[in-house]
Amino acid sequence: MDSLPSEDQPNENMCSIALRVSYGMLDYYTGGDLSGIPNIGHPAWQNLEIPVARALGPVEVHVVNHHGSIDPASPFFLATTRPRVHIIPAWSPTHPAPSVLKRLLSERAYPGPRDVFILQFREPTKATIGPRAERVKSDGGHVVVRVAPGGNSYRVIVLDDSTETYEIISTHGPYRSE
C-alpha cells in the first residue's frame, strides 16, 4: 500500500464488506458501498466488483452496491451474478445513476427477466432517467425479501415506510430460487 500514490489508496467504500447469505437454493448478496467501474485514469484494480463477482457466482437477490451511484453494477458483475431481483438503497437525488439503471435493466448484460426495487426514487431522478424509470417495480418504501421455508422460493414485499405501521404497498413473486 505504501507504494501506491495517495490518490490511488483505497477509500472506505473500497473496504466495504461484501456478503452472500445462502438459504437452500436462495443466494442474497449485499456489498455496501463497494466500488465498481473506476473513475477514468484510476487503476483497474479499483473495480472491486470483478473479484467479488468471481467469488460470488449467480445470486437471486442483489442489493446494488454504492446506492446505485455512478460506479456499481459493471457489465462483468451483472453477467456473472445474473440476479432476478435488484434492490437499490437509494437516498439521494443522484441515486440511481441513469447508466446504472440502464445496465440493471439491459438484457445484453444477461438474458432473462429481472425486477428492480428502489427505496427512494425521487421525482427529479425519474425525470432525468425518462421512460426507463417506469420499468421499476417499486419507487419507494421499505423492501422485505421473504424466503419460503427451505429457500426454494421467495417474495418481495414493499412496505410504506412513511409511517410506523408499515402497511403493505405491494407484493411481488413468488420468485423461484435456482
Model-derived regions, located:
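Flexible, acidic/histidine-containing loops and adjacent segments that form or flank the divalent-metal
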Residues: M1-N47, A109-E178
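Active-site-proximal loop/helix segments of hydrolase catalytic cores
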Residues: M1-S99
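Short acidic, glycine/proline-enriched helix-loop-strand junctions
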Residues: T81, H95-L119
